[in-house]
Amino acid sequence: MAGVFSYESSEVDWCEDNYKHSENVVEYFNTMSSFIFFVISPIMLYLLHPYAKERNLAVHLVWIMMVFVGIFSMYFHMTLSFMGQMLDELSILWVLAIGYSLWFPRKHFPSFVKDRTSFARLVLTITIISTLSSFVKPTANAYALNCFAIHILYSLFVELKSCTDERVLRLAWASIGLWVLAISCWISDRFGCSFWQKLDFCYLHGIWHILIVMATAYASTLIAYLDASQEIPYSLPDLQYWPRNNWAIGLPYIVLKGTNTTRKTC
């Protein structure tokens, strides 16, 4: 049992040179780059609070769980232990599961599910089973992650097909762009390590951490906005960016502008 907590007990080893900057930290840059989770998560919790207060305070669980993703990511890259790997991957699964249960469109629920509470219980049950199964067969977590992610992407594509709001479409394209950049860094670090070692630039996985947090901020706000437009249209949800709404780069969030019943085309 102690072996799963041992340094470098994981089969995964990223491109960054081990113990290059510290004798106690296996992957220093990958560990330090995980700090971005602790910067962005509290800001998003604050920015999305008006929406969460009106819609469901459970929305905060997404970004609270992202803090745990950051903690476990730091632990994993600091030790490259098998337990660190499992905690890192499972925390990501729980972020997806929480978002899935909160924001999956009601109109796409299976016929045997009558309300969101029942849907959330179903998702919770599947996630718990996947979590427990992962400690027996680690690939179970990968299957669950892919199932949630693919279904979320498909549902989002269906929702955006009928959307004509330019600000929403801009946010969608920004989310896709950040996600593509993040995945490209992950794949390149994982499978193109020899090339980056020749250039003495083995930090793409750390850059992935930064990009995926930003992609999550953009994508979760997009999904939350579509949800607000359907579930609480009377609140007149609108998109803005922090710290300045007219800046080219910022963190997107939802503002609620009114109480009259109305709805945009999204």
UniProtKB/Swiss-Prot annotation:
Pfam families found in the cross-reference section: Ceramidase
UniProt-recorded name of the protein: Alkaline ceramidase 1
Function: Endoplasmic reticulum ceramidase that catalyzes the hydrolysis of ceramides into sphingosine and free fatty acids at alkaline pH. Ceramides, sphingosine, and its phosphorylated form sphingosine-1-phosphate are bioactive lipids that mediate cellular signaling pathways regulating several biological processes including cell proliferation, apoptosis and differentiation. May also hydrolyze dihydroceramides to produce dihydrosphingosine.
This protein's record includes keyword Transmembrane: yes
Recorded superkingdom: Eukaryota
E.C. number(s) listed in UniProt: 3.5.1.-, 3.5.1.23
Gene Ontology annotations for the cellular component aspect, listed alphabetically: endoplasmic reticulum; endoplasmic reticulum membrane
Membrane topology, Lumenal segments: 1-27, 78-83, 137-139, 189-205
Family: Belongs to the alkaline ceramidase family.
InterPro entries, A to Z: ACER (IPR008901)
Required co-factors: Zn(2+)
Cytoplasmic face residues: 49-56, 105-116, 161-167, 227-266
Class of this enzyme: hydrolase
Cellular location(s): Endoplasmic reticulum membrane
Membrane topology term: Multi-pass membrane protein
Pathway: Lipid metabolism; sphingolipid metabolism
One GO term (biological process): sphingosine biosynthetic process
Gene Ontology molecular function terms on file: metal ion binding; N-acylsphingosine amidohydrolase activity
Regions crossing the membrane: 28-48, 57-77, 84-104, 117-136, 140-160, 168-188, 206-226
Keywords: Calcium, Endoplasmic reticulum, Hydrolase, Lipid metabolism, Membrane, Metal-binding, Sphingolipid metabolism, Transmembrane, Transmembrane helix, Zinc
Residues where Zn(2+) binds: H77, H205, H209
Residues the entry annotates as binding Ca(2+): D13, W14, E16, N18, E27
Reaction catalysis annotation: an N-acylsphing-4-enine + H2O = sphing-4-enine + a fatty acid; N-tetracosanoyl-sphing-4-enine + H2O = tetracosanoate + sphing-4-enine; an N-acylsphinganine + H2O = sphinganine + a fatty acid; N-(9Z-octadecenoyl)-sphing-4-enine + H2O = sphing-4-enine + (9Z)-octadecenoate
